[in-house]
Curated annotation (Swiss-Prot):
Disulfide bonds join C6-C36, C14-C33, C22-C54. GO terms for molecular function: serine-type endopeptidase inhibitor activity. This is Ovomucoid. Avian ovomucoid consists of three homologous, tandem Kazal family inhibitory domains. It is found in: Secreted. Glycans are attached at N43. The keyword Transferase does not apply.
Length: 54
């Protein structure tokens, strides 16, 4: 199981770094910050499917 530590999130601003992650909602997030903000917003219902684009 692959996981990402989102304990430091949410953050008000994300960088534009492009290191895509695929969420369990089948959406590609451009980087960890955007992914973790979505995880927090979803109350943890979104999880990491895999690294890279969906």
């Amino acid at each position: 199981i692959v996981t990402v530590d989102c304990s430091d999130y949410p953050k008000p601003v994300c960088t534009l770094d492009y290191m895509p992650l695929c969420g369990s909602d089948n959406k590609t997030y451009s980087n960890k910050c955007n992914f973790c903000n979505a995880v927090v917003d979803s109350n943890g219902t979104i999880t990491l499917s895999h690294f890279g684009r969906c």
